[in-house]
Amino acid sequence: MNIINEHISFGDRRLVGQEKAKHQIERILLSDRLAHSYLITGPDGSGKTAFSLALAEVVNGVNHLTDLKDLTISKKSSWFTHPDIHVFIPLPSTVGSDELQSRLELLAKDPYEIVDFTLRPALNDAESSKNRRAFYPIDYYHNEIRPKSVYKPNEGRRTVIVLTNVDTMRKETANAFLKLLEEPSGNILFILTASQPDQLLPTIISRCQQIRLHPLSKDEVAEGLINHDGVDKNDAELLARLSGGNYSTCRFLDIETLQQIRNESVEFLRFSYTQDVPELLNLINNWNKNLNKENQIALCNTLEQLLRDITVYRETENESLITNIDQLDVIKKFCTSMTEARLEEMIDNIQQLKGLLYQNVQFKYIGTALSLRFTRLMRGLDPAIDSESSWKHLPALIN
């Protein structure tokens, strides 16, 4: 029996966007020539985990994320209950078995749930900022992952092992895993995901067939929110504009909070330009105290989009190209005031410092450093501290 036919659309019940990657997977499945390992890469929130779970289900005939019609071969309701599908996520240094199980249960309910310990340290506390860097320790590999690789399929076509965020593997674990990739059994299928494939051993990449996902467009994010999350069209469009292509994260955002963030991001630029230190410190400290990580990332995306709108309008004066059209008056005023502003460098600084949020650097340090840099870049001046001496800025911001 074929895995799929031309009447089946991969991931049609849940996957958001990524039509090119979907068609690539459909061609693979139609050819009936599965590789032993696939590496799904793409930015955070683009759907890597959802794609890996959907692929695992289709290979073993589970009619869930994809409507398999008459090609269903499993009676199981999803990958979560299938005996031949094993899913692993990176773990922090201390974690209970119940805690891991609860995250997999969440993922079973929705493949776009954020279950990464680094991004979401606690499931029951949205405000938690506890540092829980997660990775694949060597004993996790030897005790949990490798034993599953010798299992023969019980009822499916393959024993499928899904490893999310393999770019967090320590060198010792990566070398051990490489040996497994080099000598796979005929019945095993590895599906790996990575946001930063450049952090992987080149030999691991060479052993996998790659499937690349791109940042989701604003329309794709909005469509996902409307169709799968029941979000109002206007709210979905606002969330999508501020998502940075990250569908997973924007599902956690509150509309009222986002509206406040939009207004305060304008104040941040204004205070940075006027060098109003008391107001800046008050604003930054409030963000550090009251915004969780998802909202802090949304704040960075808001600032970035606002600066892109200022850039576009300064170059074209074409209102139809502005994303935040309701803030057109603000954009025009900034263009008039900041005629020498080095906007691209300001955007680069946001992207650079946003990465530190994922490393659990406190926002009060990030916001302070950003405002100090903006003060000079807005005037067309070099930052007071050059990029080669970033350690002088704040100890927390060492590159």
Give each language-model segment a name.
Residues N2-E172:
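Clamp-loader machinery-focused feature within the broader ASCE/P-loop NTPase space
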Residues K171-N175, I297:
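Conserved strand-to-helix beginnings and helix N-cap segments that scaffold or border functional pockets
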Residues V160-T164, F177, I188-A194:
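Structural recognition of the conserved hydrophobic beta-strand(s) that form the central parallel beta-sheet
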Residues M1-W79, G186-L189, S195-T302, L306-N399:
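Charged, glycine-rich active-site and insertion segments that engage polyanionic ligands
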Residues T168, E183, Q199:
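Residues immediately C-terminal
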Residues V150, N175-L189:
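Conserved catalytic/switch belt of AAA+ P-loop NTPases
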